[in-house]
Amino acid sequence: GVSRQAVTKWETDTGIPDIENIKSISSLFDISIDELLSNENASQKKSEHLFESVTEYDIDEPKRYDMKFGGAKRFVLCGYKGEKIRIRLVSDTLSTLQNDFKIKIDDIRKRIDVDVKRMNGVTEATAKEAVSIFVQIPSPYIGQIECAVNTETVEIHSLECDSIELDVKTSHVTLDDISGTVEINCNLDMEVLCSSLNGEVDINQISATSRIHIPENTVFTAVTKGIGTSISYEKDGQQTDRFDTSDSENIIELNGIKSELVIYTGKGRG
């Protein structure tokens, strides 16, 4: 098998996957290893989705990003070494993608506003079935990020920023190589996967039960705030005593009303 992170790093040009993943990606997309490793992979990637719409805008100083994407099947946000914000909408079924979605980018002093608007009567339900969104932000120019999206999966990769606030309706969140504070506002039950913890993850929920996976031996402090919130712990699918430490710089916080969070390592249940 090949991890979603490995595929995403190849799809979004944020890095060449580990060598053991290259063969898997090669067979997954029916692309030779030579083509994967050559500079020609950009043209190969275009054929990966039948339809796409790309919008780019030059960035020349650190900005605060306020982005509203509406509905999507999959949403991927990552930092990269370029100097443009790049928003790529892809679909295998919606041939009128370029006409049906308009991406508006406003540059207002220190702020970039991004708004994806559906046109021609396209519904959010259609967007959630047929459209995935890939966003790349230039790493040298990332300040704060606010991002709203309704989607099956949210993936955040290779970001170093003061804070990123996610207003989402999703059941799956992946945080891979993130440094800073991540705030997730979501009232659905979520599975949050952290490949590492370098900063703070704040989860704000009302009447929800979510799970967050962290690597074994991660040093962190767990904090509960709000009303009727609780955190429990699991290792390899078995409930266990709390295994956080006091006064760590890495924090996992649950805030909200009547919500539960399970912090777990190793294999999940089932």
What is each model feature region?
Residues E56-D60, V76, Q98-S179, R242-G270:
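Right-handed parallel beta-helix
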Residues D176-G270:
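Short, surface-exposed interaction patches in beta-rich subdomains
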Residues G71, S91-T93, N120, T151, ...:
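Beta-strand elements of well-folded, non-transmembrane domains
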Residues V2-I16, N39-N41:
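Recognition helix of helix-turn-helix/homeodomain-like DNA-binding domains
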Residues Y65-K68, C147, A222-T224:
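Active-site alpha-helical segments that house and flank conserved acidic catalytic motifs
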Residues K84-R86, I142-Q144, S163, T181, ...:
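Exposed beta-strand and adjacent loop surfaces of beta-rich binding modules
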Residues N39-I85, L89-T96, A125-A127, G237-S248:
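Short acidic/polar N-terminal linker immediately downstream of export determinants
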Residues E20-E35:
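DNA major-groove recognition helix of helix-turn-helix/homeodomain DNA-binding modules
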